UniProtKB/Swiss-Prot annotation:
Binding sites annotated in the UniProt record for ATP: 16, 167-169, 238-239, 247, 253-254, 270, 274
Top enzyme class: transferase
GO MF annotations in UniProt: ATP binding; magnesium ion binding; methionine adenosyltransferase activity
Cofactor: Mg(2+); K(+)
CDD domains according to UniProt: S-AdoMet_synt (cd18079)
Encoding gene, per UniProt annotation: metK
Taxonomic lineage of the native organism: Bacteria, Pseudomonadati, Pseudomonadota, Betaproteobacteria, Burkholderiales
Subcellular location: Cytoplasm
Full protein name: S-adenosylmethionine synthase
GO cellular component, one term: cytoplasm
Cofactor note: Binds 2 divalent ions per subunit. Binds 1 potassium ion per subunit.
Residues annotated to bind K(+): 44
The protein's role, per its UniProt record: Catalyzes the formation of S-adenosylmethionine (AdoMet) from methionine and ATP. The overall synthetic reaction is composed of two sequential steps, AdoMet formation and the subsequent tripolyphosphate hydrolysis which occurs prior to release of AdoMet from the enzyme.
Provenance organism: Verminephrobacter eiseniae (strain EF01-2)
Amino acid sequence: MANDFLFTSESVSEGHPDKVADQISDAILDALLRQDPRSRVAAETLTNTGLVVLAGEISTNAHVDYIQVARDTIRRIGYDDTDYGIDYKGCAVLVAYDKQSNDIAQGVDHASDDHLNTGAGDQGLMFGYACDETPELMPAPIYYAHRLVERQAQLRKDGRLPFLRPDAKSQVTLRYVDGKPHSIDTVVLSTQHHPDQSATATTMKQSFIDAVIEEIIRPVLPKEWLHDTRFLINPTGRFVTGGPQGDCGLTGRKIIVDTYGGACPHGGGAFSGKDPTKVDRSAAYAARHVAKNVVAAGLARQCQIQVAYAIGVAEPMNITVYTEGTGVIADERIAALIKQHFDLRPRGIIQMLDLLRPIYEKTAAYGHFGREEPEFTWERTDKAAALRAAAGLSPGEHHRKEG
């Protein structure tokens, strides 16, 4: 890669229409898991002006008021006024759930008498990633893009910037020198707002622009990275119509926002609305857990993990490690250590990360990774010391490539 380059990642707020859909899907998953941890769930959501459609496949012994869960989620996000295009009190909610296919269930439920050898719910490939660009071991562009829209929501909800509305998008372009973050080149922040914040049809009031820069952006970004940074605030001007009224929202359409902002490949499977027997979700969480522990152990400055599964088969097809030359031991040796220290069978993952709990709605906005809340068990670095010891490394041996 070039010595001096730019890299960009984006995020969206909890009020973005696709994120509204993700949060409803995960709120329904949580409601089911609270009553029946064995629920099999693939909950999809569509949001549009004044309308929510709930569809997918659910097999459960739980009794959940799906319509009320959807309304409560929309209210929490902040869509409580018909002027916003959707109002939790009056929107229509249509429910069209089926049961899980028996053909899938037989491969997952009866792959083995040993519950740890329960098969994967589908084929697929998943990636995990970690790097040392932030204390959370996340790529800096996506990490700070998340923090920007998270702060937008915080200041909207606590009344400090009462003219904001729920929908927002952020984008951070970071300059790298010698492979390390050097400075922030450009920040884009587009936020929905009340009509009185527009100066003209295509421009915003300067007071609005100043408030967004000083109250949202500057408190979040590292001061030492702000060298001649460009700030683009609502660059097309007026952003009054937003959320599900501005665009139809669907579950699973923000998979790069949900993961690493494009810093590593993506297997294509979305997360929200899926119970942890779906390896699209659980194995991606496990791959992040593995990669983060590898970096936390000092075995590499960055680590990409690929795992793949076949439906009905418990053991992964492969566990592949790529450290892009930053490893202190060979990638193949890191892969061998991973196999020794992590059980990446679907049931092993569920047990290792304690995933049969109602923890998922919180993951559905501001990223599934790089979060320190206790629900995010895949962010623990509890295997780092064991990995380091097994690699035979002492504290002074970081970043020495094995010959």
